[in-house]
C-alpha cells in the first residue's frame, strides 16, 4: 500500500531548488525510497533535476547551498502508511517517532527523514 503525497512545501526558500552536492548521486535515493521519478534534467545555470510523484514536484540542484539547512514538508494522506512504505523501500529507521506538531489552527501527525545528502524531510498528515 502506498501513501498519496498531496503537497510539498520548502522549509526555507524553494522546493524546486533544494541544494545537494551531487545530483546524480542523490537521484537513486529519491527514486527508491520516496518513489519519485525524474521529470527533467538541466545543466545550466547549474546541474539540477525535477522529480515528481503523485502530482507534486521537487527539484534538486547543485547550487552551492547547504543541504543541512534545507528540506521540505510533504503532506500525505496517511502518515503511518507513508512510514510503512518508506520502510519497505529501505528506510533505515526502526521507529517513526511520530509526534503531533501544531501550526496555526492545524495539527499534524509527523515524522522526519534525513536524506544522505543532508536534506531533512517532514512527512505529515493533517489531524481532524
Model segments located where?
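Conserved catalytic-core motifs of GNAT/GCN5-like acyltransferases
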Residues: 17, 37-42, 100-101, 128
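Vicinal oxygen chelate
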Residues: 22-23, 72-120
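Short hydrophobic/aromatic beta-strand element in the GNAT-like acyltransferase core
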Residues: 17, 48-50, 57, 73, ...
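Amphipathic alpha-helical "stalk" segments
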Residues: 1-8, 46, 55, 101
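N-terminal beta-strand motif that seeds the catalytic metal site of vicinal oxygen chelate
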Residues: 1-25, 70-72, 124-128
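Amphipathic alpha-helical segments
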Residues: 22-37
Amino acid at each position: 500500500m502506498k501513501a498519496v503525497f498531496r503537497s510539498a512545501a520548502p522549509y526555507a526558500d524553494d522546493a524546486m531548488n533544494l541544494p545537494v552536492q551531487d545530483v546524480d548521486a542523490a537521484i537513486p535515493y529519491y527514486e527508491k525510497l520516496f518513489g519519485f521519478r525524474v521529470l527533467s534534467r538541466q545543466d545550466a545555470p547549474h546541474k539540477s533535476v525535477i522529480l515528481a510523484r503523485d502530482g507534486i514536484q521537487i527539484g534538486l540542484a547543485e547550487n552551492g547551498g547547504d543541504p543541512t539547512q534545507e528540506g521540505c514538508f510533504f503532506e500525505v494522506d496517511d502518515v503511518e502508511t507513508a512510514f510503512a512504505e518508506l520502510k519497505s523501500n529501505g528506510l533505515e529507521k526502526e521507529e517513526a517517532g511520530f509526534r503531533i506538531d501544531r501550526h496555526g489552527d492545524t495539527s499534524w501527525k509527523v515524522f522526519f527523514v534525513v536524506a544522505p545528502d543532508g536534506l531533512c524531510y517532514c512527512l505529515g498528515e493533517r489531524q481532524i
